[in-house]
Swiss-Prot record:
Entries under SUPFAM superfamilies matching the protein: P-loop containing nucleoside triphosphate hydrolases (SSF52540)
Domain AIG1-type G: 46-247, 282-472, 473-677
Tissue: Abundantly expressed in the thymus (in thymocytes), spleen (in splenocytes), lymph node, followed by bone marrow and lung.
Binding, GTP: G55, K56, Q57, G58, A59, G60, K61, S62, A63, S76, R173, E174, D175, N209
UniProt-annotated stretches for the region Disordered: 1-42
UniProt xrefs under CDD domains: AIG1
Protein name in UniProt: GTPase IMAP family member 8
Amino acid sequence: MATSSHQGAAAGSQAEHRSCEASVGQGERPSASQGQEGNFKQNQGTSTLRLLLLGKQGAGKSATGNTILGKAVFESKFSDHMVTDRCQSESVSVRGKQVIVIDTPDLFSSLSCSEVRQQNLKQCLELLADDHCVLLLVTPIGHYTEEDRETIEGIWGKIGPKAYRHMIVVFTREDELDEDSLWNYIESKESLKELIKNIGSRRCCTFNNKADKKQRELQVFKLLDAIELLMMESPEPYFEPLKMESSGVQGCGNGVTYEGDTLCGSKKRQPQITGPDCDPDMPELRVLLMGKRGVGKSAAGNSILGKQVFKTQFSEKQRVTKAFASHSRVWQGKKVLIIDSPEISSWKLDESAVKNHTFPGPHAFLLVTPLGSSLKSDDDVFSIIKRIFGEKFTKFTIVLFTRKEDFEDQALDKVIKENDALYNLTQKFGERYAIFNYRASVEEEQSQVGKLLSQIEKMVQCHSNKPCVIREKELLNIILLGRSGAGKSATGNTILGRSAFFSQLRAQPVTSSSQSGKRTLDWQDVVVVDTPSFIQTPGTEKDPSRLKEEIHHCLSLCEEGMKIFVLVLQLGRFTQEDEVVVEQLEASFEENIMKYMIVLFTRKEDLGDGDLHDYTNNTKNKALKKILKKCNGRVCAFNNKETGEDQETQVKGLLKIANSLKKNYDEHSNSWVGQLKSTLGQITMAFK
């Protein structure tokens, strides 16, 4: 049979593809409904479906394409550089329909020059022809990185905000999931979770491209079922809206605007590209204006853009800017996107809006503040930004002082040096600051804007043109240990902020098996594991393996992330049983465990007006003193009857200690964490 293959047609030529008679889908497969089957075969009267493989370098696009085709057509090998350097296609007959698989290089990599990206995008459009198309976003399990984010943003920017309606996510390296589930993996990555939320949980599947033939065919069947479902849910033509959106590849023109839902959240931003000189591959600088109400953020944005686009007016009673908005201009061959924002104190009410409009993160923050204003509450402002972007945001920030006109001819450097608050503010941000005079002439205004943009560009270059990415939600596992009756379950309920564990004063142990609960606090997921008293685990006297099983069960309730141990003791009642518990923990987990443990005293209310540290420093109980010394003095106390803000204050105090301990883990003790996991996995029991 004569066949032909297209491997990156020259510009203007018609793309050709090779047709092969191999039919994926023969034999038994998971059944699809008659409606699905009919939709797949007869959709819009077309006989051809194109599957466009998209993803970063090394994601496994070519291998996935080969799995779908049932034969090795696309070159696929492990390499530290890009193997696929041009678009190529191959066809196969599937369920009575011709399916064309299009393999692509990394179309959106910032490491590729704009000419190469432009050429590849053009070839991609040629291969799409006028048929229906489904996008397959390929991403490897366990390796979701900045390049994946770059790909998602590129798809949204080049193909259009409706792209997710035509998309299925294919996770490669299924074998790396081990015993974990795909959904647990997705839940651990905030941006990935947001992507799947918008695409739909039924529009993702897993591939192991190294599996045997039967398993690979089963994977393809599941993918085809997902495609059928997509075609039922989105009956409109697939290619036409994509082609309209992607026409931006040929140039932006004047006043091109789009808004709406995007891949990683609704209304990430609404780019408004102005001017005939806009090139779709033009480097972009995303600049986020931030500050308190009335400081002049919108006015600063208008000044930078050179036009009145953001609403500005003086108002003492209400916010003028109530929602995020963005506009752009071209400056020295770059598209500068200015994102105006409401006052920062409102961000904590809807952090998702911040992430949506700045995704994957701004290249620069402009902290706008009038030169003579009070800065007393700015620390509260910074804490909100840190929660979303992490401590690193300070390295991406420039302070923009306004109202230079109020200081006449005074030198800015002198004003800053003579004002402690201003001096401390500029030191916090590496002495990066600028000033605007809103009464300046047109020439002066253009000059101050040019200087600011040059300063921004210089700062961005110091970060290799990478943005300040939105930080992934962190996770902390807290394992509560201690004797029966010490208050572990009540403490767990306090941390979770709800009654998740049964807690009652009884003579016999209430908790007979480990259990867990989860909450999110200050952009951190916290998993709390309540445990029985291991020395009183039922059946251990006759069968020591029961204890091993319980410890394994305890650890299985933890999620991927740092594990912090909290020894729960009752204030004023340190017993011999408490001492035995600690001895047995050390015997089982090695003495190292005490270096990574926090001591939490319950019944804080019994202290009255006393101080916890006075209590621990002055205790005459030698065994307790020894334990506190081994824990390096990490102690806190809970009144588990507290509610509301007082309860939250206690929890935040514990998490502060735990995160400090976590930081020590990260910086110094990664090897010990692995050793601990190994020790726990092999525990046989040395309890007395």
